[in-house]
């Protein structure tokens, strides 16, 4: 007789909301959102982002979570249960976290390394030119920190939905919010006089960040802002990678799904806005507008220099910052690993503990290759969008720029045109709950979201340039 492995479920809506928000709040909120906001006219970008979050983001999030709860299955199985002919979409969605996990954990290792540097009082060393490059091009250190980070991620997943994911989300997410609010307030109090006698303050930086700047905005410029906001939102809310389908499958039928989805949206957007409020004023104060950059350059090069400029307080603020980033990264990587583990439990009937061990070994082996991509296995490859890439960048491009928009596009076609939106509406309104923005959802999933996702795909291939 085949042994049945229990899947587990969230005990209530709070655990689900915090776990899902933890997944959505990741490195992208912290190292990409502030840069784009500063680049794209501050409040102009934020305004476009919020409108898209309430329409486009809401549609994709609702679709993923409702599919998960309706089927009670992981992505590998769920899409086939919605329609027998769409098993392939489940396979495609399940490949995304398999690609993401190893390189995300490699970056997570970088974060832990910097946390340890600031914890041990060596933050000034991290601010030196070439420190970050010297670290990632090293042979053993990145691999060791990858292993530590992967162990922490696997530990949470190994403990299961209730004792692991839900419990740790309830602890980490409130702490993350408190830390990010604290650093944001501190950033606004900063003042600095540069070598030319120019005084810059955190409040001036906040103005650059929040006040819409329509000066010189053309239709083409607005389109750039729109596509930037669209891409950032899409990658921020953890859709189209099987995560929200997996988390949705753990939600009890009596839970008010629409209320939970609204709370996830709000939490993710607030953290993204606070990340900007934390970073833009601080970077502006000490480095001016030209100090803003995106990605690893912002977090591992610019910000350590900012912390150094703060004097004695910099070491403490740097430690708190990298602790907060560690929490944000781990809650995200836990959800990525859980998406893969849930597929193994549902499809292959392997126990959670065995599945977690198998996935951890896989992520470690591929993660080592990613780490070596900056030294022994270094190469440069030109991507379709014009960027130059190494192993990590190639994996990021495949998952974020190709697979995720494709999975989301096919999901919209499946729900909007094949099985019809009523399937999702029935699941959301189960138990007599209201579906707010129902008409908006139907229009978005059938018409607008597919067009926007097609535009993202075209941009990834370098066909649509902004």
Language-model features, listed with the residues they occupy:
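Transmembrane helix-boundary motif of multi-pass solute transporters/channels
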Residues: 12-50, 243, 259-262, 266-269
């Amino acid at each position: 007789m085949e042994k049945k492995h229990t899947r587990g479920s969230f005990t209530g809506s709070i655990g689900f909301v915090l776990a899902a928000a933890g997944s959505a709040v990741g490195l992208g909120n912290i190292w990409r959102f502030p840069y784009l906001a500063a680049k794209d006219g501050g409040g102009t970008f934020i305004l476009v982002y919020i409108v898209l979050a309430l329409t486009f983001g809401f549609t994709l999030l609702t679709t993923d979570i409702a599919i998960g709860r309706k089927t009670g299955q992981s992505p590998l199985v769920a899409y086939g249960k919605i329609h027998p002919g769409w098993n392939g979409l489940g396979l495609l969605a399940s490949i995304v976290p398999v690609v993401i996990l190893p390189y995300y954990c490699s970056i997570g290792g970088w974060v832990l390394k910097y946390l340890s540097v600031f914890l041990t009082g060596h933050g000034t060393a991290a601010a030196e030119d070439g420190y970050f490059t010297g670290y990632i091009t090293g042979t053993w250190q990145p691999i060791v920190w990858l292993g530590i980070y992967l162990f922490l991620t696997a530990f949470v997943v190994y403990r299961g939905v209730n004792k692991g994911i839900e419990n740790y989300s309830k602890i980490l997410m409130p702490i993350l919010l408190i830390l990010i609010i604290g650093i944001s307030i501190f950033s606004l109090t900063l003042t600095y006089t540069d070598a030319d006698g120019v005084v810059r303050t955190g409040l001036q930086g906040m103005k650059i960040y929040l006040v819409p700047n329509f000066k010189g905005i053309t239709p083409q410029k607005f389109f750039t802002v729109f596509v930037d906001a669209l891409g950032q939102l899409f990658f921020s809310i953890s859709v189209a990678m099987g995560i929200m389908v997996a988390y949705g499958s753990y939600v009890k039928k009596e839970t008010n799904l629409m209320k939970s989805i609204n709370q996830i949206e709000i939490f993710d957007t607030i953290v993204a806005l606070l990340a900007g409020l934390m970073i833009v004023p601080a970077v502006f104060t000490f480095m001016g507008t030209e100090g803003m950059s995106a990605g690893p350059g912002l977090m591992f090069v610019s910000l350590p220099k900012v912390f150094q400029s703060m004097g004695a307080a910099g070491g403490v603020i740097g430690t708190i910052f990298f602790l907060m980033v560690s929490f944000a990264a781990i809650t995200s990587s836990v959800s990525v690993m859980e998406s893969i583990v849930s597929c193994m439990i549902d499809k292959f009937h392997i126990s959670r503990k065995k599945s977690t061990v198998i996935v951890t070994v896989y992520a470690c082996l591929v993660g080592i290759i990613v780490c070596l991509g900056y030294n022994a296995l270094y190469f440069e490859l030109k991507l379709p969008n014009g960027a130059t890439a190494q192993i990590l960048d190639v994996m990021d491009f495949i998952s974020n720029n190709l697979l995720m928009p494709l999975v989301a596009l096919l999901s919209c076609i499946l729900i909007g045109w094949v099985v019809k939106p009523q399937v999702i509406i029935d699941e959301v309104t189960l138990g007599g709950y209201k579906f707010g923005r129902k008409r908006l959802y139907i229009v978005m999933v059938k018409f607008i979201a597919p067009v926007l996702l097609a535009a993202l795909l075209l941009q990834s291939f370098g066909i649509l340039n902004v």
